[in-house]
């Protein structure tokens, strides 16, 4: 087995399969046309007619010493450029993790053909990041969210492998640095620094235990219902929902319907009966959404264990079928009450709808009302939303522009929605066995979904 084959095998072992497959596809179908490497491990760039190193040993030693001096006792280091991989190999023994960012597939090929990094790749000591990989954001969020990384994110700095990269890849370095900062900020924003929310959630959970024990165990729901149907619709409460209501009513008998709590009143108003309604809020305001609940409709309410006890108690007294469900977060799993089952609730109720649909083995999950942006009138929700169609404009959350549905220009979103969108993209990317069909026909573009007309969707998957 060649050195390159060993390195690719290490990547394909679960370390970084997308890059492993990309390298394998390259060597099977292409050859290096821009770069080559000589017996002294110096790389020649045919485009700029220049060698990467003028004095290879001296330059590698310079960057080696420079990086070590700036990173005493650092658990990880980020470096742009794989070079000939000698610097990477030498530095790896000093850190728990070494992240190497590169945009040139040929440089990956040449470096991994000459230097055996298979042991470091398999152990996680070296992680190669292909900046052109479609799922690079997902990869970085998973890496940065690890316990031995999270606590040290404040020491992040991008180091450069060699002046060659500074000269010819300056824009790529800036772009990589921007991507890393965005993902670090997203990971940090997930933190609850003063634990107030966490403590409220745990307090609610302890108060909800009696009704959790009296009602349907979530695990039983999954065991009895998974795999029964192929297609479902997840109904969210964005401003685009209003226009989809007539079609939803027409085709409601053809699909299993998952509904976020805030959209429930609109469905009831139009005689649409969802199969599932989900809630995870630790405050009381969702009571506004459930004033018209009817036990005869047989809608099953899936409530997070952290849902406010007043909401749980209200629905229970109304004799509404419900399940108080544990989050898959570690504190709940440590209770070892596995007979009740766990669900990945995420931070937004829509996220819980998708993970429930995934747990029930739906193959086609259709999204409507998932705008994640303001509409042209500045509304954050549909017209008759119980808390006000412009409720998000009062929250003073920083706003930003993002790519619009269909790729047609940009729309105005805010930071919380933008974070949520990225988490959804992570979820969808991790579940590629499911067809996620975005039939919102408005709002922000969500990657790893197929944008499709809602009427066409209904006709195709009914």
Language-model region placement:
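Classical protein tyrosine phosphatase
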Residues: 100, 265-279, 377
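Active-site/ligand-binding-proximal alpha/beta "capping" segment
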Residues: 309-368, 372
């Amino acid at each position: 087995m060649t050195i390159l084959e060993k390195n690719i095998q290490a990547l394909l072992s679960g370390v970084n399969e997308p890059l492993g497959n990309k390298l394998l596809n390259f060597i099977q179908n292409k050859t290096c046309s821009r770069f080559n490497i000589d017996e002294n491990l110096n790389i020649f760039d045919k485009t700029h007619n220049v060698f990467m190193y003028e004095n290879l040993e001296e330059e590698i030693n310079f960057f080696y010493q420079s990086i070590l001096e700036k990173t005493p006792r650092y658990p990880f280091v980020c470096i742009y450029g794989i070079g000939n991989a000698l610097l990477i190999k030498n530095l790896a023994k000093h850190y728990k993790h070494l992240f190497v960012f590169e945009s040139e597939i040929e440089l990956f090929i040449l470096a991994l053909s000459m230097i055996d990094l298979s042991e470091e790749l398999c152990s996680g000591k070296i992680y190669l990041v292909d900046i052109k990989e479609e799922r690079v954001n997902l990869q970085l969020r998973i890496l940065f969210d690890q316990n031995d990384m999270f606590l040290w994110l404040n020491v992040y700095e991008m180091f450069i492998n060699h002046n060659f990269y500074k000269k010819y890849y300056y824009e790529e370095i800036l772009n990589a640095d921007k991507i890393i900062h965005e993902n670090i900020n997203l990971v940090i924003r997930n933190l609850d620094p003063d634990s107030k929310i966490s403590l409220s959630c745990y307090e609610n959970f302890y108060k909800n235990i009696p009704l959790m024990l009296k009602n349907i165990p979530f695990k039983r729901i999954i065991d009895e219902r998974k795999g029964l149907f192929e297609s479902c619709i997840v109904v969210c409460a964005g401003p685009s929902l209003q226009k989809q209501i007539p079609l939803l009513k027409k085709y409601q008998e053809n699909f299993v319907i998952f509904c976020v709590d805030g959209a429930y009143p609109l469905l009831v108003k139009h005689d649409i009966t969802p199969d599932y309604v989900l809630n995870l809020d630790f405050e009381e305001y969702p009571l506004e959404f459930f004033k018209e609940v009817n036990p005869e409709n047989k809608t099953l309410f899936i409530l997070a264990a952290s849902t406010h006890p007043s909401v749980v108690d209200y629905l229970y007294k109304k004799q509404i079928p419900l399940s108080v469900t544990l989050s898959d977060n570690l504190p709940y799993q440590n209770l070892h009450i596995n007979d009740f089952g766990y669900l990945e609730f995420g931070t937004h109720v829509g996220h819980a709808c998708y993970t429930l649909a995934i747990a029930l083995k739906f193959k086609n999950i259709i999204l409507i009302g998932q705008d994640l942006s303001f509409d042209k009138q500045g509304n954050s929700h549909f017209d008759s939303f119980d808390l006000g169609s412009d409720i998000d404009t009062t929250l003073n959350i920083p706003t930003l522009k993002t790519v619009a549905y269909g790729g047609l220009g940009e729309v105005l979103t805010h930071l919380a929605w933008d974070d949520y969108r990225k988490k959804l993209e992570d979820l969808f990317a991790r579940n590629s066995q499911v067809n996620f069909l975005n039939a919102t026909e408005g709002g922000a573009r969500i990657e790893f979904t197929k944008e499709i007309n809602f009427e066409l969707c209904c006709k195709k998957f009914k």
